């Protein structure tokens, strides 16, 4: 029997791992849409909200941002 995952979203901790504050919601929205329409979640949880599940998967490294090199080029260089 698989263990249910209890999850508390900490967006600040997620930003430390993935420093692209505008990319995170886009990735989560796309994954949530996939879960809602056809994909099976990578985690087992009591929460049925696809957005919460997608945030959980991203924070637990089950999904990742593709083309991260392109996103790195968009980070402004502060002098």
Swiss-Prot record:
Coiled-coil ranges (or none)? none
The organism named in the record is Thermotoga neapolitana (strain ATCC 49049 / DSM 4359 / NBRC 107923 / NS-E)
Q: Name one GO molecular function term.
A: DNA-directed RNA polymerase activity
Q: What does this protein do?
A: Promotes RNA polymerase assembly. Latches the N- and C-terminal regions of the beta' subunit thereby facilitating its interaction with the beta and alpha subunits.
Subunit composition and interactions: The RNAP catalytic core consists of 2 alpha, 1 beta, 1 beta' and 1 omega subunit. When a sigma factor is associated with the core the holoenzyme is formed, which can initiate transcription.
* InterPro entries associated with the record: DNA-dir_RNA_pol_omega, Pol_omega/Rpo6/RPB6, RPB6/omega-like_sf
Sorted UniProt keywords: DNA-directed RNA polymerase, Nucleotidyltransferase, Transcription, Transferase
Name one matching Pfam family: RNA_pol_Rpb6
Name the catalysed reactions.
Answer: RNA(n) + a ribonucleoside 5'-triphosphate = RNA(n+1) + diphosphate
Similarity-based family: Belongs to the RNA polymerase subunit omega family.
EC id = 2.7.7.6
What is the protein's name according to its record? DNA-directed RNA polymerase subunit omega
- Where are the bilayer-spanning segments? none
GO BP annotations of the record are: DNA-templated transcription
Q: Which GO terms describe its cellular component?
A: DNA-directed RNA polymerase complex
């Amino acid at each position: 029997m698989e263990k249910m995952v209890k999850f508390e979203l900490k967006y600040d901790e997620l930003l430390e791992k993935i420093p692209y504050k505008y990319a995170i919601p886009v990735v989560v929205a796309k994954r949530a849409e996939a879960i809602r329409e056809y994909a099976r979640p990578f985690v087992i949880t009591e929460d049925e909200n696809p957005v919460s599940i997608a945030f959980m998967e991203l924070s637990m490294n089950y999904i990742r941002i593709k083309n991260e090199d392109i996103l790195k080029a968009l980070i402004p260089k502060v002098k």
